[in-house]
């Protein structure tokens, strides 16, 4: 795809994201998608990706990845249809469209919970997935965790509600089970550092993970009245 057409496709994707993700709480809003895009392009540079066509796949997949997030949508099939139609309208080749859709549909934490892994993920897949996971940890991750919990009226912490072990995909996705915001660190966020796939992602995750460990330790100290 020519450079001008690629730039136009990205602008249209940004507009689609703003439109489709409007009204969501700040944990999964358009700003999240834009941060993931920026992280993905930065990781791609560190991983040596320089082909404009490959970078376009990374950028569009990162921008569009949360339009069909199950936590906010009632019809994931329709949301994926919106994405597929958009990719065709902006002139991407069939192979590029298929790769972007594969990244979006396969990159979620819920897929690894259920062991539905892409056995040999492409570098582009790994980059976008790592970028999304980086935005889930560290200072931004802490802010997003409590923002989402607040939007669902979840308790910050309840010592009687323990983190769930060996989560199935169904339990992880359940909107019915009572959970606390602090438990999300144990059930998901603390696990992400060791699930990074690119060397660049692994390196960045170390600092963000340590920040969360310190935060949660301080949280428990303050909750118990010891600090």
Model-derived features with residue positions:
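Short alpha-helical hairpin
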Residues: 1-18
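RNase III-family endoribonuclease catalytic core
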Residues: 72, 91, 97, 105-108, ...
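An active-site-proximal "capping" alpha-helix that borders the catalytic cofactor pocket
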Residues: 36, 77-90
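His-Asp-centered metal-binding catalytic motifs of divalent-metal-dependent phosphohydrolases/nucleases
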Residues: 52-74, 79, 83, 101-111
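Divalent metal-dependent phosphate-bond-processing catalytic cores, especially two-metal-ion Mg2+/Mn2+ enzymes
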Residues: 2-5, 21-30, 34, 38-50, ...
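Short, well-structured alpha-helical segments
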Residues: 30-37, 55, 59, 97-105, ...
